Amino acid sequence: VTEILIALMSGPQDGALLTFETFLDSGKPAEITFGRREDCDVCLSYDSQVSREHAVLTYDGETFWLEDLHSTNGTYVGEEKITGRTAIAPGQLFRVGRTWLRIEPLPTMLGSDDDLPF
């Protein structure tokens, strides 16, 4: 089991930390959907700039991939609008509608204590 943490960085849920458990041993990459629909994993119904099914974040065990699902207002990594599937690193900001989000690095992604400078 791997946990993926998504931090909401703006809007009425600013500061919320969402946890998703993934079972990568099933052979299927983990997927987290973003949109206004209640059945999306991250429901952003308060943001009128978010499409019903706006974007999907996929984790294949090594890389996070963000993909816009033909939304009206686009999906951005930083200030750059993405087209197609785009690799995104933990800690990097991305925007769905007007809502900024971030993938939080997991302790296993930070490396061992030997990598620390102190």
Which residues make up each language-model segment?
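Gly/Ser/Thr-rich beta-alpha loop segments that engage phosphate groups in nucleotides
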Residues: 37, 76, 99
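Forkhead-associated
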Residues: 42, 53-93
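Short, charged beta-turn/beta-strand-edge "cap" motif at the junction between a beta-strand
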Residues: 100-102, 107-108
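Short coil-to-beta-strand transition motifs
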Residues: 48-52
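Intrinsically disordered, low-complexity acidic Ser/Thr-rich regulatory segments
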Residues: 1-47, 58, 95, 108-118
